[in-house]
């Protein structure tokens, strides 16, 4: 994705260029089985298992800003971000049912079951910006040039621009969610 916008802020023209590449992947696997044993009180056994993995990577998002034709010195105006996210989920479920025939033509059907679910998430973001540091960073003839001519290895020095990390503590996290459940019920049908 490439985006350029023009805007008016306090009477000056603003140009924001954003370059973004995002990779997404989803893998899902499921197995299930249904088993019926009519000679054993109509016993039914159902099971299911699933695994899902989803990933999102944005390896080098770039956002650059020019204010009134000059390379912007705003902290949020010149950024490079590296993002990675991975979600995993797995679930196992078991269900059992039997039929019993009672007095007065009643059918008693007990059902029991079990579910185990586990979900994890791992998110990592690294943020970098360019600090205006020395005389090169204040040279107007340099700041009006295209980005490829401003941020060259010769200009990323103590006399020009410094790369600084802007990653926040909340940009990286891990999360887990585990659930284990049992259920039981009885259904009685009167004929």
Q: What residues fall within each predicted segment?
A:
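Flexible glycine-rich, low-complexity coil/linker segments exposed to the extracellular/periplasmic environment
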Residues: 73-74, 124-175
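Flexible, surface-exposed loop regions and adjacent strand-edge segments
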Residues: 2-12, 61-71, 121, 126-136
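Flexible, solvent-exposed coil segments and beta strand-coil junctions
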Residues: 4-15, 67-79, 158-168
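Outer-membrane beta-barrel transmembrane strands
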Residues: 1, 17-60, 78-127, 162-191
């Amino acid at each position: 994705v490439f985006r350029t916008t023009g805007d008016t802020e306090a009477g000056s023209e603003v140009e924001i260029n954003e370059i973004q590449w995002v990779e997404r992947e989803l893998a899902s696997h499921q197995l299930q089985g249904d088993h019926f044993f009519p000679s054993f009180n109509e016993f039914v056994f159902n099971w299911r298992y699933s695994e899902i993995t989803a990933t999102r990577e944005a390896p080098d998002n770039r956002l650059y800003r020019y204010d009134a034709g000059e390379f912007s010195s705003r902290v949020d105006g010149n950024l490079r971000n590296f993002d990675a996210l991975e979600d995993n989920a797995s679930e196992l479920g078991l269900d059992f049912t039997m039929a019993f025939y009672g007095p007065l033509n009643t059918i008693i059907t007990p059902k029991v079951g079990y579910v185990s679910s586990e979900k994890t998430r791992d998110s990592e973001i690294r943020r970098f910006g360019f600090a205006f540091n020395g005389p090169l960073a204040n040279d107007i003839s340099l700041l009006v040039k295209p980005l490829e001519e401003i941020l060259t290895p010769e200009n990323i020095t103590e006399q020009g621009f410094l790369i600084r990390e802007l990653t926040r503590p909340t940009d990286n996290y891990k999360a887990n969610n585990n659930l284990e459940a049992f259920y039981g019920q009885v259904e009685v049908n009167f004929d």
